[in-house]
């Protein structure tokens, strides 16, 4: 089978064939004849060799007509295989001699037997041994069949330069070799960057070469790569010589390590060859990404012999020249710089190469011509414009902007008919904006001389190709269809399998008519991107709801001056979902939803001058551009809805004047004016009609700025200094980058027919906190009325006359309020843009919280950027670097563009950045001196993000204070930044939670409120004014932000914690304390009180939370000397003062040691006052007379809690379902129960701490009267009583639980306790109430939170009550003891830090009066004596036992602390009732600790009378059990509420009790163990003894056996000897006879011989013979 016509295939091929035989195809092989293979001696075997190839391969691969000489991207596996199986062409293609240093892109076919193709003159990377080349080998699959072998090497000089050799496994002699330099475009973000940046190899490597040698090596490597960065301004090229020189210099001078000057020259606006630092230090290529090549041929033109799939699917493009071009006869313009575009191939499907990453495309030489500077892509404005176009592309989208001069854009217009070719590149610049689908990037070229902007976002707007062709030659577009696997992976389109998506050209509606050459028609065919898969469903749904359904508008308006903004629109559809929240995903926008908006506007815009200024303005639109009516691109049939800002314009025939006075009459009713602001809008100001023409630049600038005075501040931030703040776009419409909102909001269709409600409910509020608060403020700017406030992008009215945004509302349909959707204010309910014309066309404007997303929705990073809107950097990591830079920094935010136009500014040093996945930019920080610098993201050199702080740290310093001692140091900026980050994170989280609900509401109401917005509207305004007033102070601004966030009721929903990064483990409260922001702290307390159920808040705002070095917020305030903040924190929760940091230092100690003596004294004074109060009535609560005071106490709690007693009874206990998440963690409602910050109720764990109760009671009695917050409903105790009176106990309980449950965040937990107990429950109940509230879900006695049922009031009740009562007394004592202890503690903070809590607790317990220790001591216990009965006690036992099973690991405080790290009981345990089953199922097994069963045995031993004497000593008395129970309960509560943060008091008491019981238990257990051990030993000994005996007997048996065996062997031996003797004898006898015979024979022989002797008588002889024969006688 392997033999093919007499010649054996090479061994490898045999093997691989055998593999292919089994490759799964039924007929496994097909024979192909291969040209004769010559053996090494050159003898050609004339017969053809047959090669076995899997049938599958032959079926799926086309034969190739030509092998391209160069290709500037990696081939896909299919292409490689196709070249290698086209055997019949190999002779023609084979190169017979090795080439020296083939150029970048070269593809060469060699026969390895004839050519030593590896000796190519390049220096390839060697292995560590320095001898052999480092090769990577891999087998590649085609159609699932392994058939190719690849061998890859890369240059040791330029690591991005690779040589890849491929051969068929079945025919290894023919090798396809491909040389390619793939600069890390994705790494450095600009095609030029990578070239240099990638050259960061060792100096050693470079040192070996002379300059000439280097140039010789490098020149071919960089063949075809364009050197300019064309960041928009510079087109200066660079030569290899300069590169080499620069590198050599840099290596000699040793600049900061790992940074290299990049030739990007793109710092904002800087022209020419100013080199800014590109320091992308790490530009090594990992997987080669695209090559930026715009060489002599167009970037993709492959000069090739002929194209791969040439003959196969030729699209009949309307003209015939395409073939020639395709064949490489025409140098192609550089158009799409794409990873895989080959201009040449027609519709060939290039399948992505799985093994080689086929890179994302790059727009390689943007504006390579120096004189093109004013083309749209250049300069700031144009940059903006482009950006805007780009903003909307999907993640993998790249925007190709290439200025093609004198060549048509080669791309394909998808449906072959002439009506597609979007108008031609005439002398006028036709912008071809085509967003193509499915990863195939096509630009739809314009053919015909009219200028046209054709925006065809086809199926998925993957790449926006903006190419302005400056020459009118009508070249036929060629399809550049490439499947870009990266795009595909990120955004797999519908129906596309990995093999390469079929072009869905049919999507593009073919109605775009080619309008006659004279006209400039811009047709936007926006066929929306099919379903872009998104992550944010909430938005999706909302979108799907029709808000955008209409959105694909085709604007055919001739005069649509597409300034940056407008161009965006269509592309907006492409937004691909990005991972960051910011991105809107339109995925569910149903594709075919209605493109009702097909329409065309005709009109002329006389005013557009042909100014060179960059813009998408038609440069010579001076003649009116009538558009034919039929340019309607009727999108209605095209399949995806395009999510453009264009709203459904149902019927309106008003004209929108897009430019100055152009009156475009909109013929079709559904006119969508994509009035994307800017150019479309005249500068709106009092000046009314500043037509484009008239307004000179200066004027324009003034105008615009006027137009948003409010904007003034924003514009300051964003305007590039360039033109006086106003960038003039062509025709004098000033484009104000400061229009902060521009990009954000959809253009309101002024003339929309009524129904167009556009609800852009933006989803995520990321933007809201700009880390630089200045930005923040801008974001919060809100409308104060007066058209001046409209953001610069006032949505212009659709007034048919002109855009003059006249002051009168009628003209300017959007009143400012509607327009200025202030960017971020969360409150921004729904602004509606009601256009004056279509009254109802209100755009229920987004909840701004979500504006950002809208922005994304709009697609528009670019837009935003263009409009000066700033994006939020949501996160970046790492936040620092050493001074030499070179660290990879990832920055997350709403970045969408897959183009390489991003850069990051580190303190104004620009470095290229690349989008490694939607929402994540990567850059490498430049070298910089130590210190903090701002880090911002720029797109096309326009800054588009807020600034965040990046730190350069000196090498000497550790990253973070590694020792506790440097810890409490402050870096203001860093802390401020962190505050903002924390808020941002919370806000994002909030947005996630609210998103869905708000969408529902929003989409429901197109009217102003949109449902959810109404509530927030008010605060919006207030916030705005507030912001203005407070603007100066960072703290006040943050307070405003917090208040706004606070006013949104979205916190209760969170079910899971999300906490991204913390700064040194510090929460918001820590940061505020460190900065000394007392007002902020109070605000946070209020916030926490208000949203008591929010886990997020609880994490961020908790006075007892500690950072990485165990510092509480109070510790920070004390350490940094912030008196006011420290007092606020201390009052809120005084326990924090006794929490030491990891070095054991207490806050007061640190304050003193750092010289903040006043602060320390103040806090000590507060402490003393409290203790004094405690001292006055320590025992108030013990006697039966306690009731009144408790009532008042409760009442006071109640009032603190602000809760109104009449909480609906219907609310059931949610706490019960999930206490773990609810109250226990987020119990804050009591903490700051009132919104007053004056009496800070106990936060968190405090609850059960009895002593705390006391202090609380005493402390609160006075405070209750002075509660200052207005919102405390002053309910007098009496009113309180009345309510409770009516409650039946069960109701009361339910009330508690209700309190505990989140639904009414404001009601504090205590409300319930306040409201019931007072009246008819006696203190027993009261206690129950209190404890329950505190313990919420606490097992057993107070399981109200859990069981929320009357059962709580049953037998269990006495227990708990008793517990409380008992406890109380203990506590009184404890309180005073502790207070004194604390005073001492304050005095000598450092010494008693390590106070042994156990001893303390034991002292306390010893101090407990004896009467309390009496069994039946029942203070104020009316009904519950049954408590003492063993039954009840034992009922608690099972619980206690299981608890102790866990708790017994808490012998010492430290252990207790550790135990706190995991919950002891699951949250909704119903078995806690005494009657319930034992809770042992809850206990977590701790392997070596006694089990619950052991404990229960121990405890029951205590209650049973039949305990043996020895045991009697070891058991607990009932009282001890009671105490133990309380302690355990306390621990559990505290623990439950504060996983991980045991409180000091709880530790003291509980640990002591438990410790004591534990010791007894240990003795008991020890005794038991001894007994068991004795028994065990005895039994073991017995069995051991028996075993020993048995073994001995066994040994004897063995011996006997052995002896017997040896005896047997002996016998056998003897026998053998005997037989041997016999045999011997026999042998001997037989030998004897033999000898005798022999002797006789010898004699006879002798006689015979002698017979003839004359001496012998013959007769004698004969006779003897006869005798012998027996004849003789």
Swiss-Prot record:
ANK repeat locations: 1064-1093, 1109-1129, 1143-1172
Induction line: Detected at low levels at interphase and in resting cells. Up-regulated during S phase and mitosis. Levels decrease at the end of mitosis.
Medical condition linked: Cerebellar dysfunction with variable cognitive and behavioral abnormalities: An autosomal dominant neurodevelopmental disorder characterized by mildly delayed psychomotor development, early onset of cerebellar ataxia, and intellectual disability later in childhood and adult life. Other features may include neonatal hypotonia, dysarthria, and dysmetria. Brain imaging in some patients shows cerebellar atrophy. Dysmorphic facial features are variable.
Protein name, entry field: Calmodulin-binding transcription activator 1
Chain residues forming the annotated DNA-binding region: 63-188
Keyword Transcription regulation applies: yes
Keyword Transcription regulation: yes
